[in-house]
UniProtKB/Swiss-Prot annotation:
It holds the Pfam family ATP_bind_3. ATP binds at S34, G35, G36, A37, D38, S39. The N-terminal region contains the highly conserved SGGXDS motif, predicted to be a P-loop motif involved in ATP binding. This is tRNA(Ile)-lysidine synthase. It comes from Rhodococcus erythropolis (strain PR4 / NBRC 100887). Ligates lysine onto the cytidine present at position 34 of the AUA codon-specific tRNA(Ile) that contains the anticodon CAU, in an ATP-dependent manner. Cytidine is converted to lysidine, thus changing the amino acid specificity of the tRNA from methionine to isoleucine. It comes from the Bacteria. It catalyses: cytidine(34) in tRNA(Ile2) + L-lysine + ATP = lysidine(34) in tRNA(Ile2) + AMP + diphosphate + H(+). Keywords: ATP-binding, Cytoplasm, Ligase, Nucleotide-binding, tRNA processing. It is found in: Cytoplasm. One of its GO terms (cellular component) is cytoplasm. GO terms for biological process: tRNA modification.
Amino acid sequence: MLLPETPALLALRQAVRAWTVAFEPRRRVVVALSGGADSLALTAAAVAETDSVDALIVDHRLQPGSDAVARSAADQALALGCRTATVLTVDVAEGGSLEAAAREARYSALRDARTDLPVLLGHTLDDQAETVLLGLSRGSGGRSIQGMAAFDAPWGRPLLGIRRSVTRAACVDLGITPWEDPHNNNPEFTRVRLRHEALPLLEEILGGGVAEALARTATQLREDGEALDEYAEALLLRAVVDGEVEVDTLAEAPTAIRRRALRAWLLQGGAKALTDKQLRAVDALVIDWRGQGGVAIGGGTPEARLVAARRRGRLILGFEDRRRV
């Protein structure tokens, strides 16, 4: 399909072209297509700027008629020039956050179906701004407000510098009607309220440019974070001996680098859903040692908990029988 040369479509093509040059020299990609404006616009630009595009459409089966929506998205993908368009049906786990469960099911299906290709996602600058605000609300440090990466294999996000208004304009230019997901207007979801209430209010109070400023901040923090991670990795290489960490080597490092090294070591050892409180408690074993006991870390089993402890000048990580607690 030959795309018209409108400002919106040219901006999208430039964004996809830049992403491809940086991350996918093979010029072969998969696009995660919902049928919404963002992913449709991304699909059109990807077809124009790469050699091969396969579309994957996930049917969460959470709404009546979702199968028809998925089939329509597949038809649109083929009309735009995708090589293939495949509908993936998933089961969304009940209980807890519906939004989180749907996301987990969707990403799992996309990961399984992508073969060895990167999966392009239609996240825009607006999505990035919302992600930063959500991270701020958690208050868990700079990592939580770094936002989404342009490429976090296998996930690619070429449109992080593109406003949502541009993707909608592109769909108008293409003469295609995007699907409007009812969940995107459901105030039960925190992100929806940020989108429709919090961000517009901030724009009004602060005089505009808030979304761009939040996205710019995320980029700067991610660049800083990547540099700190490199220093932390080098520190960990020096400190780890037979899977254990020498306390004296860690204690010499600046706090930001030391805690990043500890976080990496804990995650490598099987920690799950590591909290700031847990990380600080493990850090205290290094810099505030008073003979305290080990620190329980998420990632254990029903029978045993994962514990970080200090023994003979080293940190060790192992399982402890819950019946002994």
